């Protein structure tokens, strides 16, 4: 049986959850039905994600550590440089994933399922996502 959604996100880790979070925060999507398909929701990745970013952003709630200076150090040279506009930030994946999933699970227009995506059938006006247990 085919179940219809306006948007389907395949994968619920870093890139999928960043996309889902941006959709969640955008009122243009309030009347859209969004499905997130993830093969294994019970085992969140235990990783750290690091990135460069301007001082303040919407990701700061998830940042566990940040650096505002660089140190170049060798036996013959040492230089510490302060980063003016950017900082290097670190997020722990487990906290990020749990926080975003909790927010999305409480939304009326998001559905999260655990299933294995097998493939896609694309036509002119739609895409069918085939999983082990269904078609969307």
Question: Which residues does each PLM region occupy?
Answer:
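Beta1/beta-strand and adjacent pyrophosphate-binding region of the FAD-binding site
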Residues: 1-15, 35-37
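Short, Lys/Arg-enriched, disordered terminal segments
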Residues: 1-5, 25-31, 106, 132
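Residue-level preference for short coil/turn positions at secondary-structure junctions
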Residues: 3-5, 10, 30, 113, ...
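Aromatic side chains
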Residues: 5-7, 51, 88, 136
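Residue-level preference for alpha-helix termini and adjacent loops
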Residues: 13, 50, 66, 87-90
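N-terminal FAD cofactor-binding segment of flavoenzymes
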Residues: 18, 22-77, 95
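Conserved N-terminal helical subregion
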Residues: 73-136
């Amino acid at each position: 049986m085919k179940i219809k959604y306006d948007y389907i996100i395949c994968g619920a880790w870093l890139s999928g959850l960043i996309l889902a979070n941006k959709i969640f925060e955008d009122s243009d999507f309030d009347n859209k039905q969004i499905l997130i398909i993830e093969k294994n929701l019970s085992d969140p990745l235990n990783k750290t994600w690091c990135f460069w970013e301007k001082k303040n952003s919407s990701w700061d709630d998830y940042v566990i550590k940040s650096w505002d200076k660089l140190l170049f150090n060798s036996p013959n040279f040492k230089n510490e440089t302060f980063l003016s506009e950017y900082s290097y930030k670190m997020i722990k994946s487990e906290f990020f994933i749990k926080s975003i999933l909790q927010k999305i699970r409480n939304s009326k227009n998001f559905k999260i399922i655990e299933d294995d995506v097998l493939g896609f059938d694309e036509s002119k006006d739609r895409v069918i996502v085939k999983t082990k247990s269904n078609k969307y």
